[in-house]
Each structure stands twice: as structure tokens, then as C-alpha cells.
């Protein structure tokens, strides 16, 4: 990894940790930032890590000590893919890439109307569309409206129904995107609207996130560049704790 890419990866990791902290707060959970990692001492919401490293070569023992590993399901986002947590009974769930896109308009114009959810009913409609019947719509709570750096982006059809979306989280240097979806066409259909919204809302900030597999290829087609690897480690095996949706 080049020095520039490492700086970009660190900015993306910090932004992602700030989003994980916001999601935890929306569920009434306390967490804390320290020099090497963000961590929550109690189990975080489903699909969200209990810790995110902020620098390369974080101290493993101190990191594991900050989270609850008394039961299966604890997870760590190893932001630089440089830790070995096997001795603490963790296994790699999946690997991914941090992605970065300079601040600029999308190459493809959006075909939906996009806005920021600003009331509980819209957050609920967004959550139901994001979940698409998989049983986790309560993950996204109206308390997210109290987070000044978090923006739930809703793409609406001509009849006003939420059919696409993403979450944007602003930090000092970047704006992070996660949970991108479209009921028809998947992330490929959602990215133009999301990037157009970011260009309007934060015209000077680059966009970051992380993806893997087919979703990484889609992000690259929309102007992103991979800037560094990461790993998700899972304590024991508990398939409903984490998925690969890019949180």
C-alpha cells in the first residue's frame, strides 16, 4: 500500500468507525474511541462490528480486552488486514477493500428523486425498503435523526415510494457511504443518485466506503478506486451477527 493510499484508508476507517458509533448510539449503546481503535464493550447491533481499528498494527490483546467475547458473535473490523486474531478464537469472515472517489459529479444522471429522510416515518419506510422482507427493519431507528453527521438517503419512485437508498456519514476529510441498495438493479442502480446527492450536499468531500466481490466491481465502474484491504473477523461462528452488506 502506498503512503497516499494508507492515508486514504485511515480516513475511510475513521469515518466508518464514526458511523458504527452513531449506529450504536441509536440503539442506546456506549462506545469509545482510543488511539488505536473504536470499540463497544457490549454487543453492537446485528451486522455491525464490536471494534474497528484506526491504525495499522493495533495491539491485539488490548483490542480484544475492550469487547465482549464471552459469547459467540463478537466481530472486529481489521481496517488494514494486518492482525492475527486466531489465538483469540476469531476467524476471518470475509475480506474487502476500502474505496475512495474524488469529489465530482456522477457520470450517469440519476433516474429517481433523492432526498434526506427527516422524520421517523421516512426512516421507517427506508428501513423496510432496505430490509426487503429479510426480518431486520428495526435495525435503523428514528434516533438516527439525532445524529448531525448521519444522513439517511432515500431514492423515490415517481409515485413517491422509497425504492433505493444509502446512509451517508460525514467526517472532517471524507463522507462515507454504506448500506447502498436499490430494489430494482441493486447498487449499480443506486450509485448515480447517491453520488449526485453527495455532490450537492458535500461538493468538496471525497466519498469513501468499503466493498468486495461484485459490489466492489460495481463501485469501480462508478469511479471508485480500491485503496487498501480490510478483514472482518468473527468470534466463533454465528451467521446472523454479520453479513457482507458494507456497513
Question: PLM features: residue spans?
Answer:
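A short, internal acetyl-CoA/4′-phosphopantetheine-binding micro-motif in the GNAT/acyltransferase core
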Residues: 52-58, 180-187
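Terminal substrate-recognition subdomain of acyl/acetyltransferases
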Residues: 1-28, 38-43, 102-107, 169-171, ...
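Short glycine-aromatic motifs
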Residues: 29-31, 89-90, 150, 224
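Acyl-donor-binding surface of acyltransferase catalytic domains
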Residues: 54-120, 195-199, 204-217, 221-239
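N-terminal charged segments
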Residues: 1-70, 130-149, 246-247
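Conserved acetyl-CoA pyrophosphate-binding loop and the N-cap/start of the following alpha-helix
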Residues: 185-197
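A short, well-structured alpha-helix characteristic of acyl/acetyltransferase catalytic modules
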Residues: 119-129, 245
Amino acid at each position: 500500500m502506498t503512503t497516499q493510499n494508507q492515508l486514504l484508508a485511515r480516513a475511510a476507517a475513521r469515518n466508518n468507525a464514526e458511523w458504527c458509533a452513531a449506529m450504536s448510539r441509536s440503539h442506546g449503546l456506549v462506545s469509545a474511541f482510543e488511539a488505536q481503535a473504536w470499540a463497544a464493550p457490549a454487543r453492537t447491533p446485528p451486522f455491525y462490528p464490536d471494534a474497528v481499528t484506526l491504525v495499522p498494527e493495533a495491539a491485539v490483546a488490548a483490542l480484544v480486552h475492550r469487547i465482549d467475547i464471552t459469547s459467540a458473535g463478537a466481530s472486529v473490523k481489521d481496517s488494514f488486514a494486518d492482525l492475527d486474531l486466531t489465538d483469540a478464537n476469531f476467524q476471518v469472515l470475509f475480506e474487502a477493500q476500502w474505496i475512495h472517489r474524488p469529489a465530482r459529479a456522477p457520470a450517469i444522471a440519476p433516474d429517481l428523486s433523492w432526498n434526506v429522510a427527516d422524520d421517523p416515518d421516512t426512516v421507517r419506510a427506508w428501513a423496510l425498503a432496505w430490509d426487503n422482507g429479510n426480518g431486520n427493519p428495526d435495525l435503523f431507528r428514528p434516533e438516527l435523526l439525532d445524529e448531525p453527521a448521519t444522513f439517511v438517503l432515500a431514492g423515490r419512485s415517481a409515485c413517491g415510494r422509497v425504492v433505493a437508498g444509502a446512509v451517508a456519514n460525514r467526517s472532517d476529510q471524507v463522507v462515507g457511504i454504506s448500506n447502498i441498495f436499490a430494489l430494482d438493479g441493486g447498487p449499480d442502480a443506486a450509485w448515480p443518485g447517491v453520488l449526485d446527492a453527495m455532490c450537492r450536499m458535500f461538493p468538496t468531500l471525497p466519498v469513501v466506503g468499503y466493498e468486495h466481490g461484485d459490489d466492489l466491481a460495481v463501485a469501480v465502474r462508478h469511479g471508485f478506486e480500491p485503496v487498501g484491504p480490510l478483514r472482518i473477523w468473527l468470534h466463533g461462528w454465528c451467521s446472523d451477527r454479520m453479513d457482507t452488506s458494507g456497513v
